[in-house]
């Protein structure tokens, strides 16, 4: 049976690892302390502080499990080059109509964050850009129409 692999950039892997470490610390110390304090208040059946702490403990434990599962399947993408756009590359593109330049990073779906210009290689824009080279012009369909962009640069 083939093992499922989750590809991540080095930055994405480190971010998930840090989140995991922080959640483990929070679960071990902060939540355990809240549960202990809530127990000291008496009757647990009507103790909302206790129930809230236990619920948060469950949510954190589920996220820890999810992160551990992802990281166990993770393979960090290395050996990036700047000749062809691939996962992990930063890409400088220019809107040929407005002249606006934008820098985006092509990442895996687990790392995508449009507010920080991290675009999944599986997204419509990502699929168009992966494999392209500096100087090429691409057409990107957006809700407001079709836009032409020129690829100005590829960085690691």
Swiss-Prot record:
Keywords: Coiled coil, DNA-binding, Transcription, Transcription regulation. It holds the Pfam family GreA_GreB_N. The keyword Cell division does not apply. Residues 8-75 form a coiled coil. InterPro entries: GreA/GreB_C_sf, TF_GreA/GreB_CS, Tscrpt_elong_fac_GreA, Tscrpt_elong_fac_GreA/B, Tscrpt_elong_fac_GreA/B_C, Tscrpt_elong_fac_GreA/B_fam, Tscrpt_elong_fac_GreA/B_N, Tscrpt_elong_fac_GreA/B_N_sf. SUPFAM superfamilies: FKBP-like, GreA transcript cleavage protein, N-terminal domain. It comes from the Bacteria. GO terms for biological process: DNA-templated transcription elongation; regulation of DNA-templated transcription elongation. GO terms for molecular function: DNA binding; RNA polymerase binding. Belongs to the GreA/GreB family. Necessary for efficient RNA polymerase transcription elongation past template-encoded arresting sites. The arresting sites in DNA have the property of trapping a certain fraction of elongating RNA polymerases that pass through, resulting in locked ternary complexes. Cleavage of the nascent transcript by cleavage factors such as GreA or GreB allows the resumption of elongation from the new 3'terminus. GreA releases sequences of 2 to 3 nucleotides. This is Transcription elongation factor GreA. It comes from Thermosipho melanesiensis (strain DSM 12029 / CIP 104789 / BI429). The lineage of its organism: Bacteria, Thermotogati, Thermotogota, Thermotogae, Thermotogales. The gene is greA.
């Amino acid at each position: 049976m083939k093992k499922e692999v989750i590809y991540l950039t080095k930055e994405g892997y480190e971010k998930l690892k840090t989140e995991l470490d922080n959640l483990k610390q929070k679960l071990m110390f902060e939540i355990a302390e809240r549960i202990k304090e809530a127990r000291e208040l008496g009757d647990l059946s009507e103790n909302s502080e206790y129930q809230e702490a236990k619920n948060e403990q469950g949510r954190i434990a589920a996220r820890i499990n999810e992160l551990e599962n992802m990281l166990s399947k993770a393979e960090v993408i290395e050996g990036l080059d700047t000749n062809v756009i691939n996962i992990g590359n930063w890409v400088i593109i220019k809107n040929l109509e407005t002249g606006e330049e934008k820098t985006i990073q092509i990442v895996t779906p687990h790392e995508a964050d449009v507010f920080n210009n991290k675009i999944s290689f599986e997204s419509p824009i990502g699929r168009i850009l992966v494999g392209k080279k500096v100087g090429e012009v691409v057409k990107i369909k957006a809700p407001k129409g079709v836009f032409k962009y020129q690829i100005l640069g590829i960085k690691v």
